[in-house]
């Protein structure tokens, strides 16, 4: 039997995609719309306080295309806290006009494929920064879920640890070409959601998403073993721009 990779696990992650019922939103009187926006911004202010205390992080992006209109990406130490945040959002007036489109539950993950040394990894500052990240405030985001293939000779889980480590090392070399251009956060979701991993990319240049994903398709680990779900791409929505976005 092949050896399972050990993982380092950090904050839990929720990608909460919603569509907006603009027709119903437009029917609200101006003062009710403004009250709903103010209530929502008060909730976001609580998220920002949590982030400033480094007890979690969040990002809000408007989604391009018809799959969704807005994304709330939330990181917290526990699954319970994610549920509390989701529930608090759903209780707001604004949520009456935010219809569920897609969601993804996972946990920030680092594998031992690239591990070395005997030091406790949870005590290494760089590892902690990656397990408990403050999300980048870049202009653009790209999210997609993925699996490793399990078909015939292309069964990832039948490869030896050494084979998997070498394939992932080569894959990582491709990713490092985009250092400074793209920030990547990998979240594990085996047993938590429908795919095995979620990949979230951040950049100030959306074209880099296309370049990175395309180049990685030629890595053997992706060409032979990668299976992908839907891709979501969006633009950052800063708190100060929320009133403008929801203005009618």
UniProtKB/Swiss-Prot annotation:
Keyword Lipid metabolism: no
EC code: 1.3.98.5
SUPFAM superfamilies in the record: Dimeric alpha+beta barrel
Annotated active site: 144
Pathway as given in its UniProt record: Porphyrin-containing compound metabolism; protoheme biosynthesis
Gene Ontology MF annotations: heme binding; metal ion binding; oxidoreductase activity, acting on the CH-CH group of donors, oxygen as acceptor; peroxidase activity
Keyword Iron: yes
Gene3D superfamilies per the UniProt record, alphabetical: Apc35880, domain 1
GO BP term, pick one: heme B biosynthetic process
InterPro entries per UniProt: CHDC, ChdC/CLD, Dimeric_a/b-barrel
Segments forming a coiled coil: none
Binding site for Fe-coproporphyrin III: 130, 144-148, 171, 184, 222
Cofactor binding, note field: Fe-coproporphyrin III acts both as a substrate and a redox cofactor.
Keywords: Heme, Heme biosynthesis, Iron, Metal-binding, Oxidoreductase
Pfam families on file: Chlor_dismutase
Names of required cofactors: Fe-coproporphyrin III
Reactions it catalyzes: Fe-coproporphyrin III + 2 H2O2 + 2 H(+) = heme b + 2 CO2 + 4 H2O; Fe-coproporphyrin III + H2O2 + H(+) = harderoheme III + CO2 + 2 H2O; harderoheme III + H2O2 + H(+) = heme b + CO2 + 2 H2O
HAMAP family with a match to the protein in the record: Coproheme_decarbox_1
Family according to the record: Belongs to the ChdC family. Type 1 subfamily.
Function in brief: Involved in coproporphyrin-dependent heme b biosynthesis. Catalyzes the decarboxylation of Fe-coproporphyrin III (coproheme) to heme b (protoheme IX), the last step of the pathway. The reaction occurs in a stepwise manner with a three-propionate intermediate.
Protein name: Coproheme decarboxylase
Protein source organism: Geobacillus thermodenitrificans (strain NG80-2)
